[in-house]
């Protein structure tokens, strides 16, 4: 599991390795046909600052080679803002005095119809807070079932699930999962997520392994850049 891999990584040694990279290391990484982890450290090091435009051009070239000159749009739809976590940066924080809403099946379908009136959108991202008791797997499965006649590509951004739960949702039309990981630094993770299910670091980072085990087609890990790692 990914959490086991993280245990073997020293933040101090990794930081030292990044800051020790030289101009020659950066140029070697830019010329490499396939980058290694060591090459990646060179490209995010202070020594790479003069090469930002070069990296931008390479990034554009590789992106066009992989995806073509296309733009793919998706619509995010919040099914509920109910959440049992206490993430310090989030407006859904359980202690925030705000009205909590969980859309009913009828309200969900009304939202789908409204989205289709906006344009020919086919990619839908269903988003929830973390409240498995009130908006758990069965609720998400129902939302996916309702969405299938309207959209061809269905993704979710919800609480981390068990492998068998991800697999269950694939049978309801799930194509992909997006999961935000605010930091991979275990100590700082505790500061940002003091209470709730999301405070379980290993459960969170190992979610990507469980998605793969379940056969989820598209797995999208996202990392915030404004939180100190």
Regions found by a protein language model. Give the residues of each.
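A structural signal for short hydrophobic/aromatic patches embedded in well-ordered alpha helices
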Residues: 40-43, 55, 111, 143, ...
